């Protein structure tokens, strides 16, 4: 009878554990990252009684979580890809809205300005038309300033997004390292996997992949080694490695991502960081925001510089040679923070606006010579032992005859130009519409030339062998941003669908199905009742034997 009682007890114990496991699944059906658990049973070692082997009941081998590593990796990859495209799309949509707005964009005010120039040229002696020209010019300047301000605000928003994302990455990786330690200790001490802790760790990995592309390599001791981007270690066993944010070496207003020694982490290139919100935001800044702000600045410089050049060829109402109508800021030159002598600076000036590009440039001194590189296509534009040098309509120089090895400078010809644009005067008499100092007030020779600038091939556009008009250059910029926005709209939706499908596939295997759990609950309940009945019968039989013995 003791054998029957023992078998019944093992069955009762298994049923109890099964009910507890199912109950745990039901309780966590809505818990993020929870993977359902199942009880694993095995028959107890049978005993040989001579006439054959008699079973000894059941053993509970363990509680196993249903987790598919392949599906999990698919979800992690899809999450990083989806968040990257979504972050890029949400940011570029703002730029697209800014540029394409028919009332807030640049094209209407440029058109209005040249219409006023034409009107003034048609009636050069009329003060009212001259005043209208001044007002239209001021409106155009204000619009350039406003667009640049909004782009600067987007740039500040990107800085905030980068900082927030890096903070989240460091928090998740620190928690993963802590769980690695706890899980490893639990496995070593009991030999069993702490399923709920492992779920928590996998959920943290999933959250980490929302911020950056994440790769996980499982170790023999149950710990995870986690790598980000193109292979930067974030977690190795119980050791966590942080990302940092720091100002760019050549632009203190630009937040960059750095890695390495906490005292002096090295700035990472955009190519090193991919996927997730952080990757998407950095890609948007480097591919779209920088390019658009530079192009807007290029348009402002080119229009203003060429208008000034023609204005100074004419004569005003007082028969005085015209002066610059627009105030145009000089290109910005920034010394690297790593330069040996910070007093050694670079400078740049525009010599031919029609040759100006929307790219930034670097000037580096190595092995006895300077190298000037155009950054948008990585082209080496000039090399020599001494400066100045003229590159793409711009003269570049340094203020030293004794450069140090490794000295580096960043030249930004156009990024800040739209924000610096202003009117140099507002006196209507100073508009130089006349072509000669001796002709009468009806002389409009120079006014007609100023108006003709609207349709001239004045702006250099990347990828084109011929220059474009101001309107064409702006339209091409708007079109490029619009095309990229539409592309990302489609891509982000496709990536979101891929993530949804990957998540559904994993949930169908690892998620809690309440209908299935209810069925299992009834099954274990019946097993529990049957085991109890078995023990009751065994007990009754034992009582009969005792009575027979008396």
Q: Which role fits each region the language model picked out?
A:
Residues 1-550:
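S/T-rich, low-complexity, solvent-exposed segments of bacterial secretion/appendage proteins
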């Amino acid at each position: 009878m003791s054998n029957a009682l023992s078998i019944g007890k093992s069955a009762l114990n298994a049923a109890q554990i099964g009910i507890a496991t199912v109950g745990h699944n039901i309780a966590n059906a809505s818990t993020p990252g929870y993977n359902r658990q199942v009880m694993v049973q095995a028959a107890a070692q049978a005993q040989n009684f001579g006439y054959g082997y008699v079973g000894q009941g059941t053993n509970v081998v363990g509680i196993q979580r249903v987790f598919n590593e392949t599906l999990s990796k698919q979800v992690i990859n899809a999450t990083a890809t989806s968040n990257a495209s979504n972050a890029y799309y949400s940011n570029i949509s703002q730029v697209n809205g800014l540029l394409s707005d028919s009332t807030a964009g640049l094209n209407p005010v440029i058109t209005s300005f040249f219409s006023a120039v034409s009107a003034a040229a048609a009636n050069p002696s009329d003060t009212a038309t001259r005043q209208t020209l001044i007002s239209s010019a001021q409106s155009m300047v204000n619009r350039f300033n406003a667009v640049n301000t909004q782009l600067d605000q987007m740039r500040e928003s990107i800085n905030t997004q980068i900082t927030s994302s890096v903070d989240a990455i460091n928090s998740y990786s620190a928690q993963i390292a802590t769980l690695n330690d706890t899980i490893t200790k639990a496995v070593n001490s009991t030999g069993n996997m702490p399923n709920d802790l492992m779920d928590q760790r996998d959920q943290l990995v999933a959250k980490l992949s929302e911020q950056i592309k994440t790769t996980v390599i499982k170790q023999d001791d149950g710990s995870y080694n986690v790598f980000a981007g193109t292979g930067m270690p974030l977690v190795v066993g119980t050791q966590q490695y942080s990302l940092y944010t720091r100002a760019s070496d050549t632009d203190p207003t630009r937040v960059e991502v750095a890695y390495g020694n906490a005292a002096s982490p090295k700035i990472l290139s955009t190519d090193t960081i991919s996927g997730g919100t952080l990757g998407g935001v950095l890609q948007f800044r480097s591919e779209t925001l920088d390019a658009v702000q530079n192009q807007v600045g290029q348009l402002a410089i080119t229009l203003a510089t060429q208008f000034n050049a023609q204005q100074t060829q004419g004569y005003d109402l007082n028969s005085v040679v015209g002066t610059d109508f627009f105030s145009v800021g000089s290109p910005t030159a920034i010394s690297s923070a790593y330069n040996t002598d910070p007093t050694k600076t670079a400078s740049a000036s525009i010599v031919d606006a029609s040759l100006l590009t929307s790219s930034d440039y670097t000037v580096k001194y190595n092995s006895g010579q300077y190298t000037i590189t155009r950054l948008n296509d990585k082209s080496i534009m000039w090399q020599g032992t001494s400066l100045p040098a003229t590159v793409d309509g711009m003269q570049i120089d340094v203020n030293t005859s004794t450069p140090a090895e490794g000295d580096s400078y960043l030249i930004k010809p156009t990024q800040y130009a739209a924000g610096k644009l202003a009117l140099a005067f507002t006196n209507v008499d100073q508009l130089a519409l006349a072509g000669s100092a001796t002709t009468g007030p009806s002389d409009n020779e120079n006014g007609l030339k100023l108006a003709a600038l609207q349709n001239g091939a004045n702006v250099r556009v990347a990828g084109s062998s011929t220059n474009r008009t101001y309107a064409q250059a702006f339209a091409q910029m708007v079109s490029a941003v619009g095309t990229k926005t539409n592309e990302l709209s489609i891509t982000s939706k496709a990536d979101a669908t891929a993530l949804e499908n990957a998540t559904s596939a994993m949930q169908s295997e690892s998620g809690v199905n309440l209908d299935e759990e209810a069925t299992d609950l009834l099954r274990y309940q019946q097993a529990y009742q049957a085991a109890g009945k078995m023990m009751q019968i065994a007990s009754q039989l034992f009582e009969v034997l005792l009575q027979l013995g008396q």
